[in-house]
C-alpha cells in the first residue's frame, strides 16, 4: 500500500492508505499530470510514489516545483538521474579507494609501522602547529581525540557486522593494522583522519596526486576533495536524488574551486551544478 497526506482533521494530518490506482487518480486530479495505463502504473510502482514522484517533483527545494503535465516528463528526469548515478558510482568508488591508498602509502613510508596507536601518536599531530593552549589548538586536539573515537567505533561497528578483515585480527588477539582500518572507515571518517595528519604527510600526498602546488599552500586540498565528494558518494550509494545537487548540505571550499579552474581552465566552478562534480 502507498500513503499520501490527504485528510486533515483539526490540527492533525493523517495518513490515508492509497492503492496504486488511487495515487494515479490523485496525480491526475490534484496535480494535473497525465498518467494512465498498465505500463505507467508499473513504472510508478517500480519507481515508488515517494522516491519517484515525491522525490522528483522539484529542483533543489520543494518550493521550486517542476510543472509536469505528463508522467513521461517525470520518468525522463527519473531515468536521467538513475543513469547518472550508474555512471558516477564506479568512479566515486575508484576515487575513494585511490585516495585511501595514496594516503596509506605515505603513512607507512613516514612511520615504518602499520600500528594505529603509533601512527596516531607520531603522525596525527597537526594540532602542534597552533599556539599551545589557544582556542585553535584546543579545537584541533578535540578533533584528533574524536578521530580516535571514530576509529574504535568503526572497528566495533564492523566487528558487529562480522566484517572478516576486522574479526580476523581480533580473534588472533592482535591490533588491527592501519590498512584494515582504512577499509572500514567511511569517506567522512577518513576525511577527519586525514585532517589531523601532519603537514609533511599531507604535502607528500598532494605531490603524489599531482595537485597544482601553488593552490595547495597548506596541503589541505586532498581533505577538501574528500569532503566535496563525500555527500555525492553517500547520495549515490543510498540511491538519493542527485541531478540537482540537493545532497550538498555544506559549502565547498572556494580554494578547491579556484584550483580546479586553474587546472581545467573552466571558469565559474561552484558545485551548484552536478556537472561541476563531474569535472
Positions of predicted regions on the chain:
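Acidic/aromatic/glycine-rich contiguous surface patches that form carbohydrate-binding/processing clefts
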Residues: 239
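Extended intrinsically disordered or low-complexity regions, especially N/C-terminal cytosolic tails and loops
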Residues: 1-231, 243-279
Amino acid at each position: 500500500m502507498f500513503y499520501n497526506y490527504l485528510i486533515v482533521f483539526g490540527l492533525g494530518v493523517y495518513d490515508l492508505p492509497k492503492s496504486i490506482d488511487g495515487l494515479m487518480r490523485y496525480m491526475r486530479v490534484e496535480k494535473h499530470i497525465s498518467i494512465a495505463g498498465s505500463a505507467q502504473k508499473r513504472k510508478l510502482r517500480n519507481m515508488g510514489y515517494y522516491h519517484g514522484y515525491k522525490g522528483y517533483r522539484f529542483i533543489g527545494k520543494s518550493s521550486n516545483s517542476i510543472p509536469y503535465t505528463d508522467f513521461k516528463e517525470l520518468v525522463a528526469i527519473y531515468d536521467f538521474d538513475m543513469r547518472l548515478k550508474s555512471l558516477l558510482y564506479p568512479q566515486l568508488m575508484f576515487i575513494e579507494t585511490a585516495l585511501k591508498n595514496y594516503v596509506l602509502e605515505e603513512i607507512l613510508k613516514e612511520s615504518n609501522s602499520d600500528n594505529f596507536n603509533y601512527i596516531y601518536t607520531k603522525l596525527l599531530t597537526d594540532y602542534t602547529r597552533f599556539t599551545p593552549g589557544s582556542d585553535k589548538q584546543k579545537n584541533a586536539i578535540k578533533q584528533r581525540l574524536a578521530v580516535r573515537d571514530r576509529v574504535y567505533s568503526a572497528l566495533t561497528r564492523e566487528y558487529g557486522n562480522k566484517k572478516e578483515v576486522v574479526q580476523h585480527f581480533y580473534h588472533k588477539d592482535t591490533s588491527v593494522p592501519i590498512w584494515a582500518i582504512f577499509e572500514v572507515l567511511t569517506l567522512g571518517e577518513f576525511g577527519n583522519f586525514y585532517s589531523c595528519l601532519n603537514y609533511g604527510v599531507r604535502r607528500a600526498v598532494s605531490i603524489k596526486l599531482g595537485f597544482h602546488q601553488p593552490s595547495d599552500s597548506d596541503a589541505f586540498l586532498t581533505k577538501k576533495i574528500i569532503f566535496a565528494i563525500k555527500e555525492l558518494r553517500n547520495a549515490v550509494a543510498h540511491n538519493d536524488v542527485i541531478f540537482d545537487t540537493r545532497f550538498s548540505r555544506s559549502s565547498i571550499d572556494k580554494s578547491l574551486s579556484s584550483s580546479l579552474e586553474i587546472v581545467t581552465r573552466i571558469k565559474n566552478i561552484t558545485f551548484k551544478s552536478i556537472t561541476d562534480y563531474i569535472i
